[in-house]
Amino acid sequence: MGLRRSRRRMPDERPEAEGTPGLAVELCGVRRQYGRGAGAVQALAGVDLALPRGTFTAVMGPSGSGKSTFLQCAAGLDRPSAGSVRLGGTEITGLRENALTELRRARIGFVFQAFNLLPSLTVEQNVLLPLRLAGRRQDRRLAAEALARVGLDGKAKRRPGELSGGQQQRVAIARALVTEPDVIFADEPTGALDTGTAAEVLGLLRHAVSRLGATVVMVTHDPAAAAWADRVLFLQDGAFAGRVDDGTAEEIAARMAALTAGARTGPQADVAGVAGVAA
C-alpha cells in the first residue's frame, strides 16, 4: 500500500543495522534488571531469540517468568539493562526516545487486552490514528481496506462504545495492520473475550500471518490461544525454557504444567537456535 510520507525523516528511512536477513525480531543477550544490590530483580536473564518474518509466535510462562518484560523490551517500550534488540534489521536499543517513539508508530503494531480505542473517535479515525501520529497521510481507503480484512465493513462511522468487545478487538487489529508494520505485538489479546469471540480474533491474527505476510508475537496465558501460533516459546525465571512447534492446546497445557511445577524442559541455547532462521 503506497503512502505519501511527510517531509520529516521517518524511522523506516534510517539506514538499517547489520541484522540477519529475513528476521523480524532479534534479541541478543537481553537482560533487564530492576533495582540494585540485594534487592535487585532480574526479569530477563540474557535472552537470545531470532524470529523470521511471516511467522506467528506465542510466548507463555508462569506468573513472574518475564513475559511482560520480554514483550516490552522486544517492542521498544522498555530499555534492556544489557544486550541488543533489532526490529526489521534496525538496532533500536540505542535510539533516542523521540526516534524510538517514531519507530514504534511507523513500524510496530500493538494489540492489547483492553483494546485501547479512543471512545471519542470513530472506528475509522481509530484505525487511521497510527498514520496520524506518524505524520503520514490518512488515506481513508486504507482504513476501509483494513476494516474489510477484519470483517467490519460498514462500521467506519460507529464509535467504539457501539461495538461488542469482539468487534472492538477487530478494530484494534485493523489499526495494527494499517501501517504494514514489521511486527505486531499482541499482549493477551483474547483475555477479555468469550471463547467463540476469542477464536474469531485469533483467526484474524492467523490470517494476517498466513495471507498478508505479517509477523505476530503474542504473549498469552491460554494454551488454546497459543495453539494458533506456529511455535510456542516458554519463559521461566527470565530465560527461555522450552518450545512446542505446531502443538495442540493439550500439548501446550502439559508443557505449561511442567513449568509451573518447576521443571525445566530444555536449555535456552537450543530454543534460540531452533527459533531462528531455520524455523
Regions found by a protein language model. Name each.
Residues G2-G19:
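Pre-NBD coupling/linker segments of ABC/ABC-like ATPases
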Residues R14-T20, G262-A278:
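Intrinsically disordered, low-complexity terminal tails and inter-domain linkers enriched
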Residues G22-A229, L235, F240:
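ABC family nucleotide-binding domain
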Residues S65, D187, G273-A279:
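Extended, compositionally biased low-complexity polar/Lys-Gly-rich tracts
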Residues A239-A263:
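Conserved beta-strand-loop-alpha-helix hinge in the C-terminal portion
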